[in-house]
């Protein structure tokens, strides 16, 4: 099954937060599932960290390594994505 992780789910997962239910952790770690994380969420994390609204236990620069280690694919944003959004 495919899963797109939202920002809070990812933050809870990377921080090992107890707010993330065990069944969700199991789905993320299940190698039969494919997990995705948007670069837009990484951008959101960077902004919120600068505003001291969120905290990561890991260094921000380790997000890509964490995703690679946990088989989470980072999805890019293209100009075409923005065009679709603009035309909604």
Place the predicted regions along the sequence by residue.
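Short, well-structured N-terminal submotif of metal-dependent ribonuclease cores
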Residues: 1-37, 53-65
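Active-site neighborhoods of divalent-metal-dependent phosphate/nucleic-acid chemistry enzymes
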Residues: 55-61, 69-88
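Positions that flank functional sites
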Residues: 43, 64, 82
